[in-house]
Amino acid sequence: MARAAWGLLWLLLGSAGAQYEKYSFRGFPPEDLMPLATAYGHALEQYEGESWRESARYLEAALRLHRLLRDSEAFCHANCSGPATSQPRPAPGPDGDNEGDGEDWARELRLFGHVLERAACLRRCKRTLPAFQVPYPSRQLLRDFQNRLPYQYLHYAHFKANRLEKAVAAAYTFLQRNPKHELTAKYLNYYRGMLDIGDESLTDLEAQPYEAVFLQAVKLYNSGDFRSSTEHMERALADYMTVFARCLAGCEGAHEQVDFKDFYPAIADLFAESLQCKVDCEANLTPNVGGFFVDKFVATMYHYLQFAYYKLNDVHQAARSAASYMLFDPKDSVMQQNLVYYRFHRARWGLEEEDFQPREEAVLYHNQTSELRELLDFTHMYLQSDDEMELEETESLPEPEKPLSDAEFEGEGDYEEGLYADWWQEPDAKGDEDEAEPEPELA
């Protein structure tokens, strides 16, 4: 009944257009608002019934609703993540100070006081945003959207609706997160062959702002324009850190509770689920270039900066970039030699000891990611059990119900399958020459 009601509401709407057009998580049109599960479920029903245009319309609406929820969660948690405005004061011990059990009790009380304040802040924030006025989606549904599964259905729906340009964009968007998915790669090559589309025309509908800036910085680096390259790379680095912080904040949204547990195990379950999401942020935000994810993405940006600043004779920044890189790859012998070289000539360039310290944002990022992984490893080692907690493994993506038949490929010829960027080069003298590991092959 509820689904029918939402469906009637949606039928009153005009064409949705691209999923992110005129998007605002603060002022989302009330008439466009519906539960994510409702929009996506109806899209799949229409897909099964071969109502391709209607299916595509609801899939785009679902993608838009998912972004609304993701951005709204990140906004509220980022705005409520500051230090507590007031904290309970520890009760004094018999002699006026806090020792032993009293100190532990006081520390725990302060912690939960901060939790309560943050919960109140989140409640106030979410009360004002459209995304939280409808039922919250399940964890599995959110995982499907994180893996870009809707684009598997969307590209084929667009193809059957004779919207080849949109089919290309949807298929390419899915492959940017799932580059080893052979069937979707076959679809994309088929669509590109029909339209004669080159690599430069491919669009990732979920691309982050730093990705294009990073690629432009690499192109400028390879052309020898080191000044412009450093400007673009610094911007890409700053943009990435902003998106990474937003990703961490978005991992603290609503969580399903499926059984009854003691107080602390229940808290540990929720915290471990949030930890897994935060650890995944690093991989989920890594750009895909030519079908491969950029290995050690943040470290790679510092490596480019190190060499570009050196070529610009800005050795102060070059040394700090080298030290920042070493946080992520301390065994890189070439970078070790670079730092030795800078130290040997420190008098010549007027370098101080602070010039050999990593940059602040690099230290923060390294500490965050390292500590998150350590905590997650602890939960895997000591908290995971059938009775206490299950940290779910990533599931293989299911295939859409309507695959292309061999007949649809007959007579079209072979099309180029390589998506490699010809201009991509590693930085000069990079010590780590290992290729980026591809994602596990999906079903």
Curated annotation (Swiss-Prot):
Chain positions covered by the region annotation Disordered: 81-102, 387-443
GO biological process: bone remodeling; collagen biosynthetic process; collagen fibril organization; peptidyl-lysine hydroxylation
Gene3D superfamilies tied to this protein: Tetratricopeptide repeat domain
Biased segments, Acidic residues type: 387-398, 407-419, 431-443
Keywords: Endoplasmic reticulum, Glycoprotein, Signal
Gene, per the UniProt record: P3h4
Name of the protein: Endoplasmic reticulum protein SC65
Organism: Rattus norvegicus (Rat)
Subcellular location: Endoplasmic reticulum
